[in-house]
C-alpha cells in the first residue's frame, strides 16, 4: 500500500512513524509551505494508492480535486468542517471511496456501536456529552463529541444544547448537554453520561496517545483501498476490525 500523507503537523508525523513500523510504504508527504516536503498535491509524481489527510479545512478543495482527478481513495481525518464542506465530501464520494471521520480510533468506533444499542433503552435518563482536550485545540466542541451527539440523536429525539449560562430554566428531557474542557496536554477524552433518578451510567473513552488515531487512519486506508466509490465511516472500521477478529477466532 503506497500512502500519501497530506498535512505534516503532529498527527502527520505520527502517521509516518506508525506506517514505517507497520511496513507501510509512505511514498509522499505533502505539507503546504514546507521546504522539506512537497508543497502541493499537484507536484506529486510518485505512485499513490491512498491519501491520509490530517491537514485543515482550507485545503479540502485541492484534496478532493486530487482524489477525483487521479481516482485515489481518501482518508479524511481533518476536523472542523462546515456543513457545506461535509456536503462537498459526500458529493465527491460518488466518484471515489472516501473515509471521513473526526476520530479514527477503534475505541470510538466501539463506543458509537455501544451508543446505538444503549440509547434506545435510556428513556427517562438525561444525556450529557463531556469532552476534554489539550489547551491548543481550537474547535469546541470536538468533532468526536459532535459525532457522538449525532449517534445519540439518531436513536432519541434530543436537541444539543451548547450553553446554559443564559438559560434560566430547568433542564428539559429532550436536551442533550454538550460540554468542552480545554487544558494541559490531554490527548482526548470523551464521556457520555446517562443521569437517571438516583443512579448514573457513564461510557468513557480516553486516548492515551495520538498513535491510536494513526493506527485507525492506516486501518481505514486498508479498509477502503479496494472498495467502490462511496462515503465510509467509523461503522465500516468497526465492521472490518470485527471481521478480522472473528477470522482469528
UniProtKB/Swiss-Prot annotation:
Q: Isomerase: is it a keyword of this entry?
A: no
Where's it found, cell-wise?
Answer: Cytoplasm
- Entry GO terms, CC: cytosol
Recorded catalytic activity of this chain's protein: (S)-2,3,4,5-tetrahydrodipicolinate + NAD(+) + H2O = (2S,4S)-4-hydroxy-2,3,4,5-tetrahydrodipicolinate + NADH + H(+); (S)-2,3,4,5-tetrahydrodipicolinate + NADP(+) + H2O = (2S,4S)-4-hydroxy-2,3,4,5-tetrahydrodipicolinate + NADPH + H(+)
> Which residues take part in binding NAD(+)?
77-79, 101-104
Which biological process, per GO, is one annotated for this protein? lysine biosynthetic process via diaminopimelate
Class in the EC hierarchy, top level: oxidoreductase
Q: Which residues form the active site?
A: 133, 137
Q: Which Gene3D superfamilies match?
A: Dihydrodipicolinate Reductase, domain 2 (3.30.360.10), NAD(P)-binding Rossmann-like Domain (3.40.50.720)
The EC number(s) given in the record are: 1.17.1.8
Which NCBIfam families is this protein grouped with? Answer: dapB (TIGR00036)
Family in the record: Belongs to the DapB family.
Which HAMAP family would you find in this protein's record? DapB
Name of the protein in question: 4-hydroxy-tetrahydrodipicolinate reductase
Annotated organism of origin: Exiguobacterium sp. (strain ATCC BAA-1283 / AT1b)
Amino acid at each position: 500500500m503506497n500512502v500519501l500523507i497530506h498535512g505534516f503537523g503532529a498527527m502527520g508525523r505520527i502517521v509516518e512513524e506508525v506506517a514505517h513500523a507497520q511496513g507501510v510504504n509512505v511514498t509522499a508527504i505533502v505539507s503546504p509551505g514546507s521546504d522539506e516536503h512537497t508543497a502541493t498535491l499537484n507536484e506529486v509524481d510518485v505512485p499513490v494508492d491512498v491519501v491520509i489527510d490530517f491537514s485543515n479545512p482550507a485545503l479540502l478543495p485541492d484534496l478532493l480535486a486530487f482524489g477525483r482527478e487521479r481516482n485515489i481513495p481518501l482518508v479524511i481525518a481533518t476536523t472542523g468542517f462546515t456543513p457545506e464542506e461535509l456536503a462537498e465530501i459526500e458529493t465527491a464520494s460518488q466518484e471515489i471511496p472516501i473515509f471521513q471521520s473526526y476520530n479514527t480510533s477503534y475505541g470510538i468506533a466501539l463506543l458509537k456501536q455501544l451508543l446505538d444499542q444503549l440509547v434506545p433503552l435510556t428513556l427517562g435518563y438525561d444525556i450529557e456529552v463531556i469532552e476534554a482536550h489539550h489547551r491548543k485545540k481550537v474547535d469546541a466542541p470536538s468533532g468526536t463529541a459532535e459525532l457522538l451527539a449525532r449517534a445519540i440523536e439518531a436513536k432519541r429525539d434530543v436537541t444539543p444544547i451548547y450553553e446554559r449560562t443564559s438559560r434560566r430554566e430547568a433542564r428539559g428531557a429532550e436536551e442533550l448537554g454538550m460540554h468542552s474542557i480545554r487544558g494541559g496536554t490531554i490527548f482526548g477524552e470523551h464521556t457520555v453520561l446517562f443521569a437517571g433518578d438516583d443512579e448514573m451510567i457513564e461510557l468513557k473513552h480516553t486516548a492515551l496517545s495520538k498513535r491510536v488515531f494513526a493506527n485507525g487512519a492506516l486501518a481505514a486506508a486498508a479498509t477502503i483501498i479496494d472498495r467502490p466509490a462511496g462515503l465510509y465511516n467509523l461503522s465500516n472500521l468497526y465492521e472490518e476490525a470485527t471481521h478480522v477478529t472473528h477470522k482469528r477466532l
